[in-house]
A protein has these predicted regions:
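N-terminal hydrophobic/helix-forming segments and targeting peptides
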Residues: 1-189
Length: 189
């Protein structure tokens, strides 16, 4: 079931002021300001030149790093706070912070980007060109949980769309002998 998310652009990796980032574009109706300073996880696949598919999931487990879209501190955001709520964070500002350590054994520019590429190559066997055939997305790195003292509600990423999927599937599965074919269609994109 599709849910609002941040898809990585085809050439997402860049470095600015010695910080590595992924460029994104948002999918679905999001409130952009809600995506800053929130731990994010990376999910998706790299499709390599030889057709090999490398699945990626980073940030869901406690022992894994998370990612974040940084925001300005209130005392540094005098221009930003003049914007409307809808423009407080612009779409082109939804860039995900992914690292800051430079590659150690090299002289030159974009050493943080080079180090991130090295780490991705070591773990997944991918290169920068492999981002062109990748389908990668950033989502909140939070697990579903009970909400309220009485635990009467569920809080989770994607609940707005997914909350309808479970009862639809349950209804189909609980039909004993349908007069006609029972069907629930659950899709993404």
């Amino acid at each position: 079931i599709d849910s609002p998310r941040l898809d990585l652009k085809p050439n997402p990796l860049y470095e600015e002021a010695d910080i590595g980032y992924f460029k994104t574009h948002y999918y679905g109706g999001i409130k952009k300001y809600q995506w800053t300073a929130v731990p994010l996880a990376l999910h998706g696949v790299f499709v390599l030149k030889d057709g090999t598919v490398k699945e990626v999931s980073v940030g869901e487990r406690e022992d894994e790093p998370k990612f974040v879209i940084n925001d300005l501190l209130p005392h540094l955001a005098s221009e930003q706070i003049k914007r409307t709520l809808n423009e407080g964070i612009k779409g082109e500002e939804l860039n995900v912070l992914i690292g800051s350590h430079p590659f150690k054994d090299d002289k030159g520019s974009e050493l943080v980007k080079l180090n991130i590429l090295k780490l991705l190559n070591e773990k997944y066997g991918v290169t920068e060109e492999d981002f062109l055939s990748a389908e990668l997305e950033m989502v909140p790195a939070a697990h579903a949980c009970d909400i309220g003292f009485d635990r009467s509600m569920i809080g989770a990423y994607g609940q707005d769309d997914r909350v309808c999927a479970y009862p639809a599937l349950t209804a189909v599965l609980e039909v004993k002998t349908p007069e006609r074919t029972a069907l629930a269609i659950l899709t993404d994109k």
